């Protein structure tokens, strides 16, 4: 009976050690690559963030590029391009693209299209308010080592 308790205690301690150690090795699934502000002219600016959202082995990655738009300091909308790239150290290619967007504070978002060409992915759309239209254009390119710009 005493031996059974020792074995059970050792099993419980081992399970607890592994259960407590797992969170230490957990990684965030999203990594911010860069954030910067772009002046688009006519009082419009965009806060741009590029994130690595998924790593699929050593030869494919998914990135997103989001742009939050402001007119005179007032938030007017957001657009996001998400793209998947494959690469092998010699070449790269964009294998898929999707997008989303929203208008805010009287602005509407529409006319969105996404596509890929070679090693790049693209999003095109329009933010509109009355007779004012702002062209939204986002692109992501990947080099042969899986780095984006």
Model-identified regions with their sequence ranges:
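Mature secreted bioactive peptide module from preproproteins
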Residues: 48-149
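N-terminal prepro-regions of secreted/extracellular proteins
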Residues: 1-73
């Amino acid at each position: 009976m005493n031996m059974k308790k020792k074995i059970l205690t050792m099993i419980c301690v081992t399970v607890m050690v592994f259960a407590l150690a797992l969170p230490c090795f957990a990684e965030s699934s999203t990594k911010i690559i860069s954030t910067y502000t772009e002046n688009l002219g006519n009082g419009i600016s965009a806060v741009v963030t590029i994130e690595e959202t998924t790593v699929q082995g050593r030869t494919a990655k998914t990135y997103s590029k989001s742009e939050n738009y402001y007119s005179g300091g007032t938030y007017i909308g957001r657009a996001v391009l998400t793209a998947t790239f494959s690469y092998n150290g010699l070449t790269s290619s964009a294998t898929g693209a999707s997008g989303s967007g929203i208008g805010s504070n009287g602005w509407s978002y529409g006319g969105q299209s996404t596509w890929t060409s070679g090693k790049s992915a693209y999003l095109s759309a329009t933010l509109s308010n009355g007779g004012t239209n702002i062209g939204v254009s986002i692109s992501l390119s990947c080099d042969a080592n899986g780095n984006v710009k």
